[in-house]
Amino acid sequence: QKVVDAIVAAGGTAVANGDDVSTMEGGANILKTALDNYGQVDILVCNAGILRDKSFANTTEQDWDLVVKVHLKGTYCCTLPVWTWMKDNGKPGVIVMTSSGSGLFGNFGQSNYGAAKAGIYGFMRVLSIEGRKYGIRVMGLAPGAFTRMTSDLPGRKDREPDPMSLPENVAPGVLFMVSDLAADHSGKVLGVSGRGVREIKMLQTKGFNVTKPYTAQDVAAHAAEVFFPEEVQRTPA
């Protein structure tokens, strides 16, 4: 509601919706709210999330299920109704799914969150392929920002955030993604934070090519071809 109030105060129009994103009913109601108020849907940004950070040994089944349900299933539940509406009505559009450096690079204490965010990356990649014939563009966002959800992370609690780390500095990157300026970039992930905007990409090496049965020792002998050089490894923001 705070964001809605800010948009209205600035002369725009906006409505809030409090449905549960992790249910099919909630996802359908979010679409209905948009259609009831604006008549069509052009953009969906899936950004709802929670944290239950613990080391894997201390993560309960409830911790796992809750985080995966909100992030991964929530992305599915919100995307399906919008996808179906765009497809059935012949309306091109843009869907942005929020992944994370935790899912793309890994981060201690976030096995549930990292698994969900990696799943969102795979989901985004598949839909970017399937969406081509419908004119539906799908991109991934890996944001870095000081938010209510991340304010209790180690090193952030009781600390004033750097102004450059606020969500306001992620918004321009997302605006680029949903605009026609990014028309040629479906299927890509952008890391967006106070330090800038960059593409995050999954790559493979040329590898060790075989023409006959091989052994584990053969793989080890060709390790320089199999693995990336250490200097090209990428780390999250």
What name fits each language-model region?
Residues T79, A116, M124:
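Active-site helix of classical SDR
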Residues G18-N29, E61:
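The beta1-alpha1 cofactor-binding region of Rossmann-like NAD(H)/NADP(H)-dependent oxidoreductases
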Residues S100:
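Residue(s) in the substrate-gating loop at a strand-loop-helix junction
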Residues A10-T13, T33-C46, R52, K91, ...:
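A glycine-rich helix->loop->beta "capping" turn
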Residues S55-F56, D63-D65:
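Substrate-binding pocket helix/loop in short-chain dehydrogenase/reductase
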Residues G103-G106, S111-G119:
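The catalytic Tyr-X3-Lys active-site helix of short-chain dehydrogenase/reductase
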Residues G140, E160-A237:
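C-terminal helical subdomain
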